Amino acid sequence: KRQRFSMITDKDTTMIAARNLGKRVPTAAGTLEILSAIDLEIGARESVAVVGVSGSGKSTLLGLLAGLDLPSEGEVWLSGQRLNDMDEDGRARVRGASVGFVFQSFQLLAGLTALENVMLPLELAGEQDARAHATDLLERVGQAERLQHYPKQLSGGEQQRVAIARAFATEPAVLFADEPTGNLDRHTGERIIDLLFDLNRDKGTTLVLVTHDEQLAGRCERLVRLESGRVVADSRTAEPA
């Protein structure tokens, strides 16, 4: 009998829901099961860490919850919409309206300045004051002196600050962060995480954080642990940030 670890949240609205989620991929040796029987609910404004050893399925789960990929079985709901019913264009529209991303690799556009990188999602959303809004966000993350710098002119920590400003630019309902400090030294990583949680609280954004760092995970309100593609624990943390 399949165990269920879905938490009942104390938030007003369920922002993300997964029902009997599974993901399999074909390989030369046969079918590889990456995720199986995932049941999960994440409430509005909640901060949730997804932890587990390398290969446990953390990043795959994040990709499914964010609509970057489709499951082999089960269903995913994001911001009240069932992603299984949508093609890639439809899922992209949901992501554009509701979701922000912060990745380990920053993923800034090399040909754009820091300011232009943050302005881009605002302009795509049709915001008239994109420049002023982007400037304010970059000032907020401590990059006021780096507006006209290109990514190659920025340190790793500076690039991640720009990436965080870009992620929060459209005030997404949900922010997905996949190992956001993985390429940074400990001191810089701690400052980036402080910034991420500060903005998360200020904006009331739902935060889903994939990490192998147990100390970082402990700063979230809730911890979901994966082993071999299954949820084996789902609990509140003692001292959320």
Regions found by a protein language model. Give the residues of each.
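ABC-family P-loop ATPase nucleotide-binding domain
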Residues: 1-24, 233-241
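ABC family nucleotide-binding domain
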Residues: 16-228
